[in-house]
């Protein structure tokens, strides 16, 4: 059994897991770090696995063990026999640091060569097959298709801060003429099948997202990557859905019945 201690953008579990294992005296030889999705701006600001190592050391993990969890043990778990250590027979992929506990990289060596600014500035773009640029197919989505019958208490999805695990609630939600009427507390969330296969749409009240005066939609939704949208009114929800389809993927913000901002991700609806 290998345990991956996760510390990403949506799910932050490192502090709880490390504290629990240290308190219980658990051997960390079968543990490694992972992020399981970390936003690029966070990677640029604070680092990637380096952040996990830094936090683990601050929580009391011995320095050498923290680095082993962030390198050798991870490579070992994945069967990457030539990675994760400095020695004969290992790839010369090395990070040079100025401080062990702060984990601040000074230089990076790849295959025995120190990388330069020119290496980072290279254009690594490649041709994109046309079929990968047309993957968002939702068809016509109307108000009728995103209605949710509601009379009294109903099932609600509760978001939890810094977690990807949600909580199932049964609560009284706002309704009008027998249908759920979203607001700033109880947003409406819709999952729209976007691969042109079934056209199915799932709808539910969402608590804890707190969008007011608009809607947010995205085609990045692990693991099936259907279109997910949440908002406090149907007009903006529909506008956001349409915006994602028109851009063939990405993140869309809608307000006042129209798209007000968009980050296009046209390659498979996932990448720029």
Which functions belong to the PLM regions below?
Residues 36:
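Active-site glycine-centered loops adjacent to acidic/histidine catalytic or metal-binding residues
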